[in-house]
């Protein structure tokens, strides 16, 4: 039985709607990832030409590379005083620590929240607070396991100090790891950033440290999963103790 015009229009509308829904669920790739994804794709074509099973392995690696450099949109809470996660990953450490000398934040302990990013996490980094970037300092170093405490002093790293309007200075350090060999920063000294704004990325596994003024109320715990630009790490304005429990 022939399909009438109205039915065809209805089918076409459903297909367009479905396509929009699929596009909305697929994160775009960050431009910094194009050379890597393209390289993996080219290698995959060559592997298929050599031996098809190798080509399928290359296909999986290309998909993984595209996922690694995904650049999803995030919904960031913007209330004054909130500190959001700068990275997707897992909170590996929360402790009072004297900040590295390059931050120039003094010799008294600050609250350090460390987030470890595996090779399966999105590696686009976002500003934890709104403010003005006072300085950016790069330090070459080793590539030991980023989960180790000494990685913050020994590993290659890039440090940012952000001056907030009402809550003092906040330090953010991108730390390279065993696999990560390239830290990328998109911002510069004197630039103003918003909470959750993209400021850099680290290629292939790493860690981010956030240094907050002593006494800042931390709202997360070690082992907790974070989403960059969305998970609230701390609240400068809160003074009534913990707001979560483990279960």
Curated annotation (Swiss-Prot):
Q: Which residues form the active site?
A: 206
Is Protein biosynthesis among the key words of this record?
no
**Can the keyword Lipid biosynthesis be found in this entry's annotation?**
yes
Cofactors named for this entry: pyruvate
Gene Ontology CC terms: plasma membrane
Instruction: Please name the InterPro entries in this protein's record.
Output: PS_Dcarbxylase (IPR003817), PSD-A (IPR033175)
Keyword annotations from UniProtKB, A to Z: Cell membrane, Decarboxylase, Lipid biosynthesis, Lipid metabolism, Lyase, Membrane, Phospholipid biosynthesis, Phospholipid metabolism, Pyruvate, Zymogen
Which reaction(s) does its UniProt entry say it catalyses? Answer: a 1,2-diacyl-sn-glycero-3-phospho-L-serine + H(+) = a 1,2-diacyl-sn-glycero-3-phosphoethanolamine + CO2
Q: Which residue numbers mark the site Cleavage (non-hydrolytic)?
A: 205-206
**GO molecular function of the protein, one example?**
phosphatidylserine decarboxylase activity
A Pfam entry, by short name: PS_Dcarbxylase
Q: Which is a GO BP term held by this UniProt record?
A: phosphatidylethanolamine biosynthetic process
PTM per Swiss-Prot/TrEMBL: Is synthesized initially as an inactive proenzyme. Formation of the active enzyme involves a self-maturation process in which the active site pyruvoyl group is generated from an internal serine residue via an autocatalytic post-translational modification. Two non-identical subunits are generated from the proenzyme in this reaction, and the pyruvate is formed at the N-terminus of the alpha chain, which is derived from the carboxyl end of the proenzyme.
This one is known as Phosphatidylserine decarboxylase proenzyme
- What organism is the protein native to? Nitrobacter winogradskyi (strain ATCC 25391 / DSM 10237 / CIP 104748 / NCIMB 11846 / Nb-255)
